[in-house]
């Protein structure tokens, strides 16, 4: 306390532990903070200010060294004032009445400015908050971060140049629910209330495929050891995308035909978007649980895809990862991707555009409200650019899929749902 008394400057508040009770340096009562350059209670603060303003002169009736406590601080004003000076209280810190008034006005003005800024700051409406909550719930219900279902796919087989490797789970079975083998016909309401949708739900849509150039190289079956497993993975992912899409606010208002068109045209794009959650920039791989389900570029090539697709896909995944999207932004981007009015074959483009506009406005408002700078700078524009990148990836995927599916020995390894969504079923 003596060291504090010798100081003529404001002590650093960081030097004091907030958890330690603060004591008035004059009387030992509970202190309320630094007043006039010393830690004091409200009583001694007021006493010092009044004494300095009145230029009061006090005389001690005793020896001039009274011990000042909370109980007797009113008994000897001279020793109390002396104690105030001893601990470092300075009259230069006392504001005049005019200065006090100006300070109060400044504080009031600052509060008013903050209130005005707060009122002008964009806020998510109740409807927008509801949209985000629904999409988050839809994503959580249709995306399993533990990837526990992967063991039910046909097992991954990684054949090396020097010889074959055995599947990690020889007895793993290919579950019908993942392969889309259902033979039931499409109902009037194509998007049903169930979480899963079988491949026949798309059967009413007459697909028009462009004539594809004959593949220049016939793929060897030994080079496609990962095709069965990844076909099951994609089939499973398509079902999850369908489940997510059904919960997008406004999606069920569309006709069954438009729902099918949107799902077929966006499925691979949304799968690529979703896969970013498992993408790791350290080794440019997708890690879905244990090492059996860690997918590298070599695994994708063993499913029949070339670097013309894989290289831009990796670039896309890295760029998307670097945006550090919030989960709310991620689910909104997926929904916007699905509900795109410019997909070929849609009938009610105006209604689809209205739904997408509502989602886009929600995303822009969320970024302004909840995504702090510098990450929010041009974030919406960057996210829309990612959708454009996905269109290019989709186009390249379609080319490579057609090359693959025109080979009967390859198409046999695909699931009915994959065949139905990505192109005409090969007979």
UniProtKB/Swiss-Prot annotation:
Gene3D superfamilies per the UniProt record, alphabetical: Erythroid Transcription Factor GATA-1, subunit A, Retinoid X Receptor
Residues engaged in binding Zn(2+) 2: 60, 66, 76, 79
Annotated ranges, domain NR LBD: 127-423
Region (Disordered), start-end ranges: 158-190
Clinical condition linked: Rickets vitamin D-dependent 2A: A disorder of vitamin D metabolism resulting in severe rickets, hypocalcemia and secondary hyperparathyroidism. Most patients have total alopecia in addition to rickets.
Free-text note regarding domains: Composed of three domains: a modulating N-terminal domain, a DNA-binding domain and a C-terminal ligand-binding domain.
GO BP of this protein: apoptotic process involved in mammary gland involution; calcium ion transport; cell differentiation; cell morphogenesis; decidualization; intestinal absorption; intracellular calcium ion homeostasis; intracellular receptor signaling pathway
Subcellular location: Nucleus; Cytoplasm
Residues bound to calcitriol: 143, 237, 274, 278, 305, 397
Assembly, per entry: Homodimer in the absence of bound vitamin D3. Heterodimer with RXRA after vitamin D3 binding. Interacts with MED1, NCOA1, NCOA2, NCOA3 and NCOA6 coactivators, leading to a strong increase of transcription of target genes. Interacts with the corepressor NCOR1. Interacts with SNW1. Interacts with IRX4, the interaction does not affect its transactivation activity. Interacts with CRY1. Interacts with CRY2 in a ligand-dependent manner.
Residues that bind Zn(2+) 1: 24, 27, 41, 44
Listed Low complexity bias regions: 177-190
SMART domains hit by this protein: HOLI, ZnF_C4
Zinc finger (NR C4-type) residue numbers: 24-44, 60-84
UniProt keyword list: Cytoplasm, Disease variant, DNA-binding, Metal-binding, Nucleus, Receptor, Transcription, Transcription regulation, Ubl conjugation, Zinc, Zinc-finger
Known role: Nuclear receptor for calcitriol, the active form of vitamin D3 which mediates the action of this vitamin on cells. Enters the nucleus upon vitamin D3 binding where it forms heterodimers with the retinoid X receptor/RXR. The VDR-RXR heterodimers bind to specific response elements on DNA and activate the transcription of vitamin D3-responsive target genes. Plays a central role in calcium homeostasis. Also functions as a receptor for the secondary bile acid lithocholic acid (LCA) and its metabolites.
One GO CC term on file: receptor complex
Name this polypeptide is given: Vitamin D3 receptor
Origin: domain of life: Eukaryota
Family indicated by similarity: Belongs to the nuclear hormone receptor family. NR1 subfamily.
PTM: Ubiquitinated by UBR5, leading to its degradation: UBR5 specifically recognizes and binds ligand-bound VDR when it is not associated with coactivators (NCOAs). In presence of NCOAs, the UBR5-degron is not accessible, preventing its ubiquitination and degradation.
SUPFAM superfamilies per UniProt: Glucocorticoid receptor-like (DNA-binding domain), Nuclear receptor ligand-binding domain
Region (Hinge) residue spans: 97-126
